[in-house]
C-alpha cells in the first residue's frame, strides 16, 4: 500500500520574553518553548508551515470555513472564482472543506467531470491561501452500501483482517487516495498540504464506522 503524505511533523516555536518598563520594577515574563510534533518525519515544508501557522493563530481567533465553497453555490455550479461566501461576506472563506470519497471508493470512475472540478477547486483554494481539509464519506467496503449502511458490525473487523476481501478493497481505496495526495499540486508546483479528517462523528451511530458498528479498539 502506498504511503500517504498527509500532514503532521515536528517544529519548535521559540518562547517570547516580555517586559514592561513603564510601571514599577521591571517585570519579565518568559513563556516556555512549545514543541510541535508531526507524525511524518518527511512532511513537506508547506505542511510544517501550515501546522505552525495554525498553532500560532489559535490565540487570535478562529477561521471560518465552508464545505465545497468553490465548487457550487445556490445558483451556480463549477464557475471559476465562484463562492457564495464571497458573494455574501465580500471575501473567500479561510478554510475550504471537501470530500474525496467519490475519488477513491467504488464510485471512483462514475463522474470524472465532477472529480476534475473538485481537484481544480482544491488547487484554486490553495493558490488563494486557504486551509484545505478533506473528509471521506466512503461507501461500506463490506456490504457495498453507502456510508450510512450500519447494518453490520463486522466492517472494521474485516478491514483489519489481513488478506480478507474487505481488507484488499480498503487498501485499494487508500492507494487511490495516496495517488491524489502525491499529485495534488498548486500553481507553484508544490504539493498541497491537506488536513485529513476521515471517519468523523465516529461516536454517533449512523455510519458504518460509528459507535454501533465498531469497538473502541477497532477504531483506534
Explain the meaning of each model-derived region.
Residues 23-95, 101, 106, 110-113:
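N-terminal module-boundary/linker segments of secreted carbohydrate-active enzymes
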Residues 6, 56-58, 89-91, 127, ...:
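A generic structural signal for short, non-catalytic loop/turn and secondary-structure boundary residues
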Residues 1, 24-27, 195:
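Intrinsically disordered, low-complexity sequence elements enriched in Ser/Thr/Gly/Pro
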Residues 14-17:
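C-terminal motif of bacterial Sec signal peptides marking the signal peptidase cleavage site
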Residues 2-8:
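Sec-dependent signal peptide recognition
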Residues 103-219:
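Substrate-binding cleft of extracellular glycoside hydrolase catalytic domains
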Amino acid at each position: 500500500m502506498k504511503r500517504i503524505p498527509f500532514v503532521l511533523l515536528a517544529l519548535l516555536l521559540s518562547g517570547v520574553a516580555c517586559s514592561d518598563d513603564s510601571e514599577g520594577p521591571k517585570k519579565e515574563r518568559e513563556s516556555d518553548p512549545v514543541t510541535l510534533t508531526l507524525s511524518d518525519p518527511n512532511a513537506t515544508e508547506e505542511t510544517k508551515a501550515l501546522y505552525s501557522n495554525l498553532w500560532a493563530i489559535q490565540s487570535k481567533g478562529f477561521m471560518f470555513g465552508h464545505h465545497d465553497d468553490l465548487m457550487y453555490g445556490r445558483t451556480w455550479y463549477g464557475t471559476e472564482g465562484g463562492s457564495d461566501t464571497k458573494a455574501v461576506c465580500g471575501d473567500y472563506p479561510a478554510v475550504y472543506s471537501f470530500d474525496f470519497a467519490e475519488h477513491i471508493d467504488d464510485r471512483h470512475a462514475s463522474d470524472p467531470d465532477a472529480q476534475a472540478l473538485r481537484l481544480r477547486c482544491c488547487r484554486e483554494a490553495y493558490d488563494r491561501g486557504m486551509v484545505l481539509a478533506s473528509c471521506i464519506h466512503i461507501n461500506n467496503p463490506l456490504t457495498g452500501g453507502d456510508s450510512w449502511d450500519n447494518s453490520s458490525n463486522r466492517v472494521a473487523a474485516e478491514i483489519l483482517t489481513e488478506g480478507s476481501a474487505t481488507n484488499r478493497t480498503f487498501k485499494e481505496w487508500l492507494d487511490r487516495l495516496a495517488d491524489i495526495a502525491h499529485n495534488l499540486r498548486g500553481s507553484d508546483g508544490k504539493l498541497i498540504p491537506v488536513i485529513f479528517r476521515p471517519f468523523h462523528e465516529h461516536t454517533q451511530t449512523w455510519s458504518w464506522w460509528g459507535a454501533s458498528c465498531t469497538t473502541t479498539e477497532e477504531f483506534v
